[in-house]
Amino acid sequence: MSLQERVTDLESRLAFQDDTIQALNDVLVAQQRAVERLQLQMAALLKRQEEMVGQFESFEEEAPPPHY
């Protein structure tokens, strides 16, 4: 294999590696956005659950209805 062929081969590999790195970066960015969205949804669900628990606790604190 001549020096020129080796250089051409290395340049080709470098180009493929650059494409692969860019594709991996795109996937990573998309995953990070998805994680951030899920974190926001989880926080909203936790807040909603705490509100529901608070409503249930206040319901339990009410005096029981009179019985006949």
Curated annotation (Swiss-Prot):
The lineage's top-level taxon is Bacteria
Q: Which gene encodes it?
A: slyX
Which family is this protein grouped under?
Belongs to the SlyX family.
> Where is coiled-coil annotated?
none
HAMAP family linked: SlyX
What InterPro entries does this protein map onto?
A: SlyX
What is the scientific name of the source organism? Answer: Pseudomonas fluorescens (strain ATCC BAA-477 / NRRL B-23932 / Pf-5)
Protein name (record) = Protein SlyX homolog
